Amino acid sequence: MSKTIWVGAVAYDPKVVTIWEGMRRYFNDEARLPIEVVLFQSYEAQVTALLAAPGDLVPRIDIAWNTNLAYLQSDAWSDHRCQPIAMRDTDLGWMTKIVAVSGGSVATLADLKNRTLALGSRDSGHAAILPVHFLEREGLVEGRDYRTLRFDSDVGKHGDTGTSEAEVVRAVLDGRADAGAIGSPFWRTVRSERLVPEGALSEIWTSPPYNHCMFTARPELDSSVARRFAEALTRMSYNNPSHRAVLDAEGLRRWVKPHLDGYDSLREASAHQGFFKHPIAMSAAR
């Protein structure tokens, strides 16, 4: 019998329990690859568990379902020895949108000069880290060329909940901010579900594309085990009703191989903004 693989995920929403009940059932009953799931309250705790050594006074897991920031932190803190395994098709080609009130005074990036930009949680790649980074590339520096109104809700979950993006949109609508930065998936939801009056907001800028989540294995995990885990993921079929329920809940149609070229911008931004400093929990474990 195969050794159990311990997989970590962050419980950013109650649906995460349902998703991982379905994933565990698939791996154990169909893929014949036994897994157990550990839910964490923050990505920092999950990354610490992924990189923990025997004897450390923290939980240990073999594989983590990480955000892009958590994957890059795992990579940095393991001296680039952690193993990227797989990602969702929908993790490819994310973008950040800057939105403003339609017909208002902010219609281009240049109009942000001396105005207020709303940002999401400080550890959200799409709603905070990358917007600041990309705007700096465009010659707009936070605190010098524009002010920020930050909504640090659900810090530790890397923007997964969407709560801070909802706050950003509200701030733009009620005039507390002149524009706001949100992820392209949230912007699609705003429009498709009509979360604001139709035509109330317009996108004034779109970032270059980047990638989002990544299954990440600890450095010491046997590469054959990581490969079997990835192969089991790719055998999930959207045409299978039991698989589809899990895939829909997790927001994808199929699992794909790692596309590592979509993380360069966030890696640069995270290093510059101090997100690769070792967390207290990991320092204590060592």
Predicted segments with their positions:
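Alpha-helix capping/helix-boundary segments
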Residues: 45, 70-71, 114, 186-187, ...
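Acidic, polar ligand-binding/catalytic clefts
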Residues: 49-111, 122-123
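An extracytoplasmic/periplasmic, membrane-proximal ligand-sensing/linker region
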Residues: 2-9, 14-22, 217, 221-286
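Pocket-lining segment of extracytoplasmic ligand-binding domains
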Residues: 128-222
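Short glycine-/acidic-enriched loop or helix-start segments at secondary-structure transitions
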Residues: 73-76, 129, 191-192, 226-227
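Bilobed "Venus flytrap"/periplasmic-binding protein-like clamshell domains
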Residues: 4-30, 40, 93-168, 245, ...
